[in-house]
Amino acid sequence: MQHGCRFLHAPVLGSTAQAADGSLLLFVGGNEEAFHRVEYILQTLGKKIWYFPSLEQAAIMKLMCNSMIAGLIASLVQALVLGKKAGIDPRTFLEVLSFSQLNAPTLQLKGTAIIERNFSPRFFVEHLLKDITLLVEAAASLGVPVPVIEEIQKLFIEAKNSGWEKEDYCAVVKVLEQKAGIEVR
């Protein structure tokens, strides 16, 4: 805190649309006094703010959330490709999800985007891969095994290496589609 400066780190969760309408989720880490001084400004950016005493805790919370998103999309694309190969209409699968405890807005949004072949980015493959990689590194530094996200990381690396890094993260479906010899529509 040389020269009286205080530093905050505020990773966010949400898309560009949520940034535009001020409904991001913010994870703020750092000096508590500084946080309270600028909290009213941060409230204009998001619908909910969580304060963490350390910068690292705020960063890891964001990475934890994005690892859940990666897990959801990996499960979704796997199910859609398997279902398509078995002759199941992907829209029927999304409808079944909508009536179950498994339903989540992300699954419906990304499932529909996949079926409609709309990979316009809301969050790039390469950006989610970066967060997955940071989570794997953070977990290793803390001595926490994360075998599931390490496998998901491989899927995202394949998508990036195939040239889809600037597409929406649901474009990872193309990796499994190529291997299965089908396209989810």
What do the predicted segments below correspond to?
Residues 1-67:
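Rossmann-fold dinucleotide-binding core
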Residues 56-180:
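Helical "substrate-binding/catalytic lid" subdomain
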Residues 43, 184-185:
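ATP-dependent carboxylate/acyl-activation modules
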